[in-house]
């Protein structure tokens, strides 16, 4: 089942977003801060992360870098109540899939999650293909010698 991790320090926001995602058929996990995010990522390995920018123990924009370093295949969407251009630009540079303002048309978030989920699946497929290609490279073949006829 496709899964999403929702990170927000406001329980009402987490509950609302979780319900929306569950109605779309996603399995949803929740975290309230950066520390619990890392635990949830390790436990559940979601494909998409929906993360608030302002968290009690850190910043979502910076958290994107950490998440993408540990889990490069997953996609991160940042949500903020007070969006600004510099944060948005930095979020994208850090590897975020998108940066959106809370309260924007809620009808936009469902297709955005769907696109992020598709990209995350594509990322996994590309990783598998790369690993398979590397396993057949000459560097991976060790200890083999030519048979002389």
Put a short name on every predicted segment.
Residues 2, 11-29:
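Two-component/phosphorelay signaling modules centered on CheY-like receiver
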Residues 8, 52, 80:
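Active-site residues of response regulator receiver
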Residues 14, 56, 80, 84:
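The feature encodes the CheY-like receiver
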Residues 33, 59-62:
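Acidic catalytic/metal-coordinating carboxylates
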Residues 44-50, 55:
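Active-site beta3 strand of CheY-like receiver
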Residues 129-147:
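AAA+ ATPase active-site-proximal loops
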């Amino acid at each position: 089942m496709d899964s999403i991790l929702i990170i927000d320090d406001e329980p009402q926001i987490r509950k609302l977003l979780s319900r929306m995602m569950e109605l779309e058929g996603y399995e949803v996990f929740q975290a309230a801060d950066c520390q619990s995010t890392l635990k949830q990522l390790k436990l559940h390995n979601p494909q998409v992360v929906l993360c608030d920018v302002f968290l009690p123990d850190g910043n979502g924009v910076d958290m994107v870098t950490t998440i993408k370093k540990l889990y490069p295949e997953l996609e991160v969407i940042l949500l903020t109540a007070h969006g600004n251009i510099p944060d948005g630009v930095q979020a994208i540079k850090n590897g975020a899939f998108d940066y959106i303002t809370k309260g924007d048309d809620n009808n936009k978030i469902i297709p955005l999650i769907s696109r992020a989920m598709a990209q995350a699946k594509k990322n996994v497929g590309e990783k598998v293909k790369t690993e398979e290609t590397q396993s057949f490279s000459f560097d991976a073949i060790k200890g083999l010698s030519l048979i002389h006829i």
